[in-house]
Amino acid sequence: MDIPASWTFETSDVATGFDNHVREQLPWYDLATAAITHIARHYIPKGGLVYDIGCATGNIGRSLEATLKARDARLVGIDPSDEMRKIYNAPGIFVCSPAETYDYEPFDLGISFLTLMFVEPSKRRDFLRMLLDKCRPGGAIIIFDKLETHHGYFGTVMTRLTLAGKYEAGVDAKEIIEKELSLAGVQRPITLGQ
């Protein structure tokens, strides 16, 4: 996969290479998916509505497929990338829209897996408030996202751990650097104050 100079999900190359790329860059991706799936099962009622916010190719939807089917629940995947829409492979429907401008129905479960870091920081608070307002009583919003690194030496250790994981997963050092540089101004990790 060619790394764009400025990261985007709007190229065919990124979309078609996404599932492999994300697992190379984030060696714990499948473990995190499994954890989210386990938690999510506890909040999907019979006939419920689930939003996969920032659904990409449908990873979360695929992992929840059996539960959704058994409980006759609806899944709506939301993602702004038309290229991701073209290759989406999960139950439910795909809506091509920025997550923060979509008109949500009241829902039982919202899942935001590695998505908030791509929402402008100035829009995050209102977006999260809106999601909370739309979440039905007894429902849940699962957020799994990148946080700003800690300051000081511990931050250095954690950054190195991330880089080592990518390298040990077989990602070329040049590609790791290209990807990090391409995220400038596009990916803004969540701060602890948010």
For every predicted segment, state its role.
Residues 28-46:
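Conserved alpha-helix/loop element of class I SAM-dependent methyltransferases that forms part
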Residues 114-118:
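Short catalytic micro-motifs in class I SAM-dependent methyltransferases
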Residues 51-101:
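Class I SAM-dependent methyltransferase SAM/SAH-binding core
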Residues 111:
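A conserved beta-strand element that flanks and buttresses the S-adenosyl-L-methionine
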